[in-house]
């Protein structure tokens, strides 16, 4: 199992150009990672943004196969080793239809550069903005917070680049519509088993979108 820190988060580097904090860049990064690991079977489990990356990988894989099919090559050569293929896909709390209001709310949360004097205060703040995550035990909230906050300068700050919010805040309605069309095309191109997971109170993946999927 490989669980990477996407660019700008955790132990991964921050990008000098915040405009690159977007799904196309993440898909490119993950395709490179997959090429390095090259698993015999690729099962992608994606929550929220991770699911969008999975859909992006699926779309990229389809384009690669189409391009290869149209490109003649000499007989007898082995299949190319860069044949990216998803064997299974889990989409948790995400789908091809984007909720602009929710994404703007997420951008606002990401942009807030809050610092807390104690870890307990950081956990309390995280619980307040994460109520739609559902019920968790105190121990589970603490464990989640340890992946989100890091001790820095005598306080606790979130372990990611605040500039992650820049591309989200700059999006316009037309861009969202174009993005949705691409995501639906990627979803329709899937030729592997797909598991869709939706929480009862999710506002990122609506019941209507889940039903359409």
Predicted regions: what is each one?
Residues 107-112, 121-135, 146-149, 172-175:
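Helix-loop "lid/cap" segments that line or gate small-molecule binding pockets
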Residues 12-18, 101-102, 207-208:
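Conserved catalytic-core motifs of eukaryotic protein kinase domains, centered on the activation segment
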Residues 9-12, 97, 204:
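Active-site loop signature of alpha/beta-hydrolase-fold enzymes
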Residues 78-121:
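Flexible "cap/lid" loop of the alpha/beta hydrolase fold
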Residues 2-45, 59-60, 64-82:
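Active-site loop/oxyanion-hole signature of alpha/beta-hydrolase fold enzymes
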Residues 149-213:
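Conserved serine/cysteine hydrolase catalytic core
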Residues 46, 50, 54:
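Gly/Ala-rich beta-loop-alpha elbow adjacent to hydrolase catalytic centers
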